[in-house]
Amino acid sequence: MSANPMTEQVNRLIANRLAAGCELFLPGVGSLYVEQRGARRLDDERVVPPCRAVNFTTQEQGVSLIDEIVRAAHCDHEKAQSIYDRWLDSVVGERTLTISGVGELKGNRFNSDPEFEMVLNPYGFDPVRIRE
């Protein structure tokens, strides 16, 4: 986790909202959303179970993270904007945006942390044997 408590709190807010299936708009960045992927058959005897995955789009979708900060921190929009700006400055690196405990955005591709994938998919990804 980050050494900055404010950054940790915003990261946790993002994780909680995504785990709940919400879409989040990150102003100046784009939107994160959870996609449900269906089961797929590997062969006659095995199926990969359905899963949830975080995806990214440059379009504005869902609730603004600033509005979520207003609700969570019980503050006004101006203060929430300031928190968001400081958070964004702390998580943006060279061509990446890293949300500790959630994942990393490189270009237009979001890669979830393995631990967060298990939050979204507590039963894992191992193929399931089909009984007849």
Model-derived features: where do they sit?
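Strongly charged
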Residues: M1-E132
